[in-house]
């Protein structure tokens, strides 16, 4: 532990997104005077439009809320640690089956209100375009939480310190007006008719001819060209639908358009493909086209997506778009405490570190705030073990690999179970093991949970036969 970091009294945080807000609150509540810089509304990135803090730009879904999934497990850990993002998400959630989706405007408003009400935080709405900005000079620590859309000036300044930067594309799915959906074709329901999810999703069934026509149109559609200085590096979890389609004609049917578990009520048979629509808000006045992130030109989006059965008259509330995401090669440029190896006074948090996703970004900012708050108390906070969702995510940022890529929370980041178990038992076992390790870590690290820790019951694997665990599911 460095002596200078035991006397933190002031902090400057660049970026009031999910990670920045999480970190700011942790530090302010530990007695640190925090200046939180947010460039909106004076300047907006290509993907942002809401002046509120904590804006969600890619989707209104925070993905699965089931603790038998990597991201669901991470959410539970964050709830127990008192995450403001999870507080806001739970307060503004909209029906989405097993997923945690939110009303994005109410969500951002909730976070903004909490930040503005915190006496230890001064919110400055202006852009910080360089690490040499005079406003940063007096801060004991500087946190860059500018997100994947960090401004060009700040990105260049950071690149000068770390010796370079990496980037990839993130694509946004179109949103359509609910009243423009043809409900004589589109039907509501969940995969396998799971209870509690009825009506959370709308489903557009496709027969083989309809799918083939859509597929050919998608491949032929005109795309927004990349800028000369940008090389396309897609993250698998948010790949443009047209890029996915280029892998082969059946890729979509086995991926986002898989029809398994659905029956078309018009025919009584399983469709060849299913395209799902997910509610954007509580009133269900708008739906996003699930899995259809795209970089097609706007006119082409309208032409191609209106070929989907039931969407012939679709009114586009927001077109899909593509923006550049910026992140560092974390294992090379970051120390274990998320400080820059080249400048221990500067820390990174959120997606710019190489975590991927809303929840993961928030978790990263929350963790950094916890680490620095502990140092103020004169102690080092031990990292959760890699068997936990948070620990596994942090381990990803520390593990050198030849081609570092962003990752979301998934069981594949964790140590293998080392057991021969049936496939359906793997996720519950990963989850149960994670809960045991996390609760033990809370006690050993002296961290008091905000809510009672949840301990699931692991499946009985006595005498279980099945394939050995080789690759964990997310």
Curated annotation (Swiss-Prot):
Q: Which cofactor does it need?
A: FAD
Binding sites annotated in the UniProt record for FAD: 15-20
> Could you cite one Gene Ontology molecular function of this protein?
flavin adenine dinucleotide binding
- Biological process (GO), any one: tRNA wobble uridine modification
Location of the region described as Disordered in the Swiss-Prot/TrEMBL record = 453-474
One Pfam family in the UniProt entry = GIDA
Question: Subcellular location, in the record's words?
Answer: Cytoplasm
Q: What is its EC number?
A: 2.1.1.74
Q: Which domain of life is it from?
A: Bacteria
Q: Report which reactions are catalysed by this protein.
A: uridine(54) in tRNA + (6R)-5,10-methylene-5,6,7,8-tetrahydrofolate + NADH + H(+) = 5-methyluridine(54) in tRNA + (6S)-5,6,7,8-tetrahydrofolate + NAD(+); uridine(54) in tRNA + (6R)-5,10-methylene-5,6,7,8-tetrahydrofolate + NADPH + H(+) = 5-methyluridine(54) in tRNA + (6S)-5,6,7,8-tetrahydrofolate + NADP(+)
List the GO cellular component terms: cytosol
Protein keywords:
Cytoplasm, FAD, Flavoprotein, Methyltransferase, NAD, NADP, Transferase, tRNA processing
Family designation: Belongs to the MnmG family. TrmFO subfamily.
Which HAMAP family would you find in this protein's record? TrmFO
Instruction: Name the NCBIfam families on file.
Output: gid_trmFO, PRK05335.1
Job of this protein: Catalyzes the folate-dependent formation of 5-methyl-uridine at position 54 (M-5-U54) in all tRNAs.
User: Would you tell me the protein name for this molecule?
Assistant: Methylenetetrahydrofolate--tRNA-(uracil-5-)-methyltransferase TrmFO
Gene for this chain: trmFO
């Amino acid at each position: 532990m460095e002596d200078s970091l035991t006397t933190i009294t002031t902090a400057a945080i660049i970026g009031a997104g999910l990670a920045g807000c999480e970190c700011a609150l942790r530090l302010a509540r530990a007695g640190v005077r925090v200046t939180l810089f947010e460039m909106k509304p004076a300047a907006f990135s290509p993907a942002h439009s809401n002046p509120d803090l904590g804006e969600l730009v890619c989707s209104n879904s925070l993905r699965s809320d089931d603790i038998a999934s990597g991201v669901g497990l991470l959410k539970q850990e964050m709830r127990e640690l008192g995450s403001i993002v999870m507080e806001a998400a739970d307060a503004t959630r909209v029906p989405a089956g097993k997923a945690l989706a939110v009303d994005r405007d109410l969500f951002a408003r909730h976070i903004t209100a909490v930040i503005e009400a915190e006496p230890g935080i001064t919110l400055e709405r202006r852009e910080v375009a360089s690490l040499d900005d005079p406003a940063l000079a007096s801060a004991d620590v500087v946190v860059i939480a500018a997100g994947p859309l960090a401004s060009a000036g700040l990105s260049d300044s950071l690149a000068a310190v770390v010796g370079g930067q990496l980037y990839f594309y993130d694509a946004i799915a179109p949103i359509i007006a609910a009243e423009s959906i043809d409900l004589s074709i589109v039907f509501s329901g969940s995969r396998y008719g799971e209870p509690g999810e009825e009506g959370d999703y709308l489903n557009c069934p496709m027969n083989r001819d309809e799918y083939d026509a859509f597929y050919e149109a998608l491949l032929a559609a005109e795309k927004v060209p990349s800028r000369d200085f940008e090389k396309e590096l897609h993250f698998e979890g948010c790949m443009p639908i047209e890029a996915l389609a280029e892998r082969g004609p059946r890729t979509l049917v086995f991926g986002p358009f898989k029809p398994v578990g659905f029956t078309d009520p018009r025919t009584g048979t399983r469709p060849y493909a299913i395209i799902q629509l997910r509610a954007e808000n509580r009133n269900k006045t708008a739906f996003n086209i699930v899995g259809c992130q795209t970089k097609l030109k706007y006119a082409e989006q309208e032409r191609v997506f209106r070929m989907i059965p039931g969407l012939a008259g679709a009114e586009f509330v927001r077109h899909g778009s593509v923006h550049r995401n910026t992140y560092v090669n974390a294992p090379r440029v970051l120390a274990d405490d998320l400080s820059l190896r080249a400048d221990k006074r500067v820390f990174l948090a959120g997606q710019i570190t190489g975590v991927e996703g809303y929840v993961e970004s928030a978790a990263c900012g929350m963790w950094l705030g916890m680490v620095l708050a502990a140092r103020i108390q004169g102690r080092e906070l031990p990292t959760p073990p890699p068997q936990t969702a948070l620990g596994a995510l942090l381990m990803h940022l520390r593990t050198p690999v030849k081609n570092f890529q962003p990752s979301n929370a998934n069981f594949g980041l964790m140590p293998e179970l080392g057991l021969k178990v049936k496939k359906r038992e793997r996720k519950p076992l990963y989850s149960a093991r994670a809960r045991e390790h996390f609760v033990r870590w809370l006690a050993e690290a002296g961290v008091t949970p905000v809510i009672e820790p949840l301990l699931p019951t692991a499946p009985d694997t006595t005498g279980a036969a099945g394939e050995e665990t080789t690759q964990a599911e997310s």
